[in-house]
Each structure stands twice: as C-alpha cells, then as structure tokens.
C-alpha cells in the first residue's frame, strides 16, 4: 500500500512540476504582450521607470499565471523528489521559447529547435529514471535528517562559501566575473529548495489535522526560506544587470540544479537506494537538458534555419559545377589553341618548302 501511495504521489508531483513550467513559461509571453501593447500606445516603458503596466490586463494575467506556476512548483516538492522537480524547471524556458516564436514573432532558429528537442528528451529520461518513492513524510523525520552529521558538515561549508563570496570575493570581482553572483544564488538556492520541501511536508500534515503550527521547525523553515529567496533575488538581479541574459540563464540553471541535486543526495538520500542504471540515466538526462539549454540561449541571435542547409549545399554544388565548367572551357581553349598552333606551324613549313621549290 505504501509503495502504491509513493508512486501515486510521484505522478502527482510530476504533473504539478510540468504544469508549473507551462504556467511560468506562458507568464513571460503574457507579460511581454502587455508591455508591447503599452509601447504601441506610447506609454512610458517599464525600463524607463513607468508603471503603466499596472493598468494592463495582459500583464496582470501574466502575473497571475506566474503565481499559479510558483504555487504548483511549491506543491510539487511535497509529492515528488527534488531530484525530479528542480531539473524540470528547464521546461519553462522551453515553453517560453516556443510560445514566443508563435505569439511574439520571435524567430526560433535551428539551434533553438534542436535545444528544445534535447530538453524534452532529457526531461523524459529524468522522469523515467528519477526515484519514485519519497522517504520523508513528517516534520519529525525532516528534523532528524537536518541533524544528520553529513548534512551539518555540508550546510556549514555552504554557509562559509556563501559568506566569503558575499563579503570578500563579491565586492572585488563581482562586476567582472559572472560566476561570483551566480554561485551565491546557486549555493543559497540549495537551502531554499530544502526549505520548500520541508514546508510542503508541513502543509500536507496541516491538512491531515496535525498540530504543525506548534512545531518550531515549520517557522524556522519559513524564516530560512524568506532569507534565502531574498538573497537569491538580490544577487541574480545583479548578475542579470551586469551580464548578458543569454549567458546568465544557462549557467545559473546548471549551477543551481547541481547544488540542489547535491543537497538532495546528502539530506534526503534520494540516490541511496537507486540502481546504478537509474543514477546514470538521471545524470544523462540532466546533462542532455544542459546541452539543450545551451543551444537554445547561446545561438539565439544566429540567423540559421533548416532551409539554410540545402541552399548552402546547392551553392556548393553550383560552385563545383562552375569550377568544372571553367576547367572544361580552359581545356577546350588550350586544345583549340594547340591545334591552331600546330596547323599554323605546319602551314608555315609547307609554304617554306613551296617557296624553296619555286626558287629552285
């Protein structure tokens, strides 16, 4: 019964994670449509400090869509492993890229289409090989996991690294090195996902009628989540303000997801009972998503489509045929000139002989 319940929860979490990606990916399109609508009306743009978007219903629809996506993502952690939910967040980028090509007339080149396909394949592989059962079901179990020596050492190291990056490395190299602010967001993000996971369990217990609000861990997790998310937003905005978005997005996804997977492996031990083939499959799916996200962002400004391939082949073929024709013409000209030369030389010899005979 417990095993069947675990699989049932897994598929609920999977559905919530995928619906979250659809809502969040669609929210960017709705917001963008609203902002473009305001720009056509001549209103002051948001980038110039304007707030006219607050009167645009499309922008509010995008905000509500994003809120629904975040709620679904939050709930997904209560049912499915973080190893599955976090990497599936890449699907929101994919949804946004596909919808923007249809509704915003933004071209999705061949590299982007291949990237989308790879992201879908990688996500499918991760769904197949991700752990199906969740070990932690109560806050008491969560508190025992948080007190595990392995996680205490990991958490201590993460806090030390984050503090060094924030107070020592950041002020010196944050403006020039893209990895500084992204690393801060990523290592702190590992804690935020763990807090979300714990709060999701607390909400499940609350609906079951248990006195969760009296448990100090629930409030500690809530406070930690607020601190972690505030720090993440602060340093992610700094990275986006200084560096190119097409570079920040894939690097942040890789660093953040790697931190979450590492934290989940240590705290929840989701990988402990996984067969070797499932571990390899999960990692393969993750790296496939990374390649897909890289192709989607790194070459998004390159004008290259499927129609470009046969054109280039035809150009090469024409060039080759042209070269062969030129060579043929040159050979013909050489033959003709050689023939004319021989005939002329023969004619001169004959006329000389005739002249000699006449003189004789």
UniProtKB/Swiss-Prot annotation:
Outcome when changing residue 244 to S: Found in a patient with childhood absence epilepsy; uncertain significance; loss of cell membrane localization; significant decrease in magnesium transport
Keyword Magnesium: yes
Tissue: Widely expressed.
Keyword terms: Cell membrane, Endosome, Ion transport, Magnesium, Membrane, Transmembrane, Transmembrane helix, Transport
Membrane topology: Multi-pass membrane protein
Record field: catalytic activity: Mg(2+)(in) = Mg(2+)(out)
GO cellular component: early endosome; membrane; plasma membrane
GO biological process annotation, one example: magnesium ion transport
Transmembrane regions: 10-30, 57-77, 79-99, 108-128, 150-170, 176-196, 216-236, 247-267, 279-299
Keyword Electron transport: no
Cytoplasmic side: 31-56, 100-107, 171-175, 237-246, 300-360
Protein localization: Cell membrane; Early endosome
Record InterPro entries: Mg_trans_NIPA
Ranges of the Extracellular topological domain: 1-9, 78, 129-149, 197-215, 268-278
Entry's family note: Belongs to the NIPA family.
Annotated protein name in UniProt: Magnesium transporter NIPA2
Organism: Homo sapiens
């Amino acid at each position: 019964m417990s095993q069947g319940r675990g699989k049932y929860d897994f598929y609920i979490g999977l559905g919530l994670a995928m619906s979250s990606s659809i809502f969040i990916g669609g929210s960017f399109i709705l917001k963008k449509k609203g902002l473009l609508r305001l720009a056509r009306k001549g209103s002051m743009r948001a980038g110039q400090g304007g707030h006219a978007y607050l009167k645009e219903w499309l922008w509010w629809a995008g905000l509500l869509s994003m809120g629904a996506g975040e709620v679904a993502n939050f709930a997904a952690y209560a049912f499915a492993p973080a190893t599955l939910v976090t990497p599936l967040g890449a699907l929101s980028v994919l949804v946004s890229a596909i919808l923007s090509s249809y509704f915003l007339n933004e071209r999705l080149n061949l590299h982007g289409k291949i990237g989308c396909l790879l992201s879908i394949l990688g996500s499918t592989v991760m769904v197949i090989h991700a752990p199906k059962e969740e070990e932690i079901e109560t806050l008491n179990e969560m508190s025992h996991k948080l007190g595990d020596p392995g996680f205490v050492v990991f958490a201590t190291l993460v806090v030390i690294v984050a503090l060094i990056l924030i107070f020592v490395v950041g002020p010196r190299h944050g403006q020039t090195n893209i990895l500084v602010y992204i690393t801060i967001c990523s290592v702190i993000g590992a804690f935020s996902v763990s807090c979300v996971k714990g709060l999701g369990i607390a909400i499940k217990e609350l609906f079951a009628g248990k006195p969760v609000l009296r448990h100090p861990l629930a409030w500690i997790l809530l406070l930690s989540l607020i601190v972690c998310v505030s720090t993440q937003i602060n340093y992610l905005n700094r990275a986006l303000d200084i560096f190119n978005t097409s570079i920040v997005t894939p690097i942040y996804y890789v660093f953040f997801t790697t931190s979450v997977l590492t934290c989940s492996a240590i705290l929840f031990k989701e990988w402990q009972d996984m067969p070797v083939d499932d571990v390899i499959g999960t990692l393969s799916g993750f790296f496939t998503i990374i390649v897909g996200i890289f192709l989607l962002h790194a070459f998004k400004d390159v004008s290259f489509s499927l129609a470009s391939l046969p054109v280039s082949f035809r150009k090469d073929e024409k060039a080759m045929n042209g070269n062969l024709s030129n060579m043929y013409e040159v050979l013909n000209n050489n033959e003709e000139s050689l023939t004319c030369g021989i005939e002329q030389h023969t004619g001169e010899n004959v006329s000389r002989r005739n002249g000699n005979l006449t003189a004789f």
